[in-house]
Regions:
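ATP-binding N-terminal substructure of ATP-dependent carboxylate-amine bond-forming enzymes
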Residues: 2-115, 120
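Active-site nucleotide/adenylate-binding loops and adjacent lid/helix of ATP-dependent enzymes
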Residues: 21-26, 82-83, 110-111, 118-161
Length: 161
């Protein structure tokens, strides 16, 4: 399989200049700072973008009149997202629970630009799948043998060339 060139499948849309940045995380309540999230907020503010830090614990979603809104605990107004103007950044903590990954699927269903997609997160979380995917695109990979039983690890090692 050969990777297509970017210009073959992507083009830049007109820039309306105003986007919304949604950062999805689940940090402990006692965490006083969210270093990466704070930096993202600073950059969004510099660009004049609206920003929302959505915490999965205690958070919920609504869809009034078809529009998707994310709400943190005690936030009745929430934050409306759409595929037209929202960029969602998925923090690593979200990947700790499969049920939390459903928010990524929901955003993708609403055509929101998600960094990283559920598929990307899934592939990257699995070292072997990552190696297979990279090999599909011609990226050289070390010889790999799957070891399903630790007792046979020496035998598998002996077969590496």
């Amino acid at each position: 399989m050969k990777a297509p060139k970017f210009r073959e499948f992507i083009s830049e849309a007109p820039d309306n200049g105003k986007y919304k940045l949604l950062v999805i995380t689940d940090e402990p309540e006692q965490a006083k700072t969210f270093h990466t999230a704070d930096r993202l907020r600073e950059e969004a503010e510099k660009l004049g973008w609206k920003y929302y830090l959505y915490k999965l614990t205690g958070g919920y979603t609504t869809s009034p009149e078809g529009a998707l809104r994310l709400h943190n605990k005690d936030d009745d107004k929430g934050f409306e997202v759409s595929g037209a103007d929202t960029i969602a950044i998925i923090r690593g903590s979200v990947t700790r629970k499969d049920s939390w990954m459903d928010i990524v699927s929901l955003l993708e269903k609403h055509s929101v630009c998600v960094v990283n997609s559920r598929e990307t997160i899934s592939v990257c979380a699995d070292k072997y799948r990552t190696a297979l995917r990279l090999a599909d695109y011609g990226v050289k990979q070390p010889v790999t043998h799957l070891i399903n039983d630790p007792e046979n690890s020496e035998q598998a090692f002996e077969h590496l060339n």
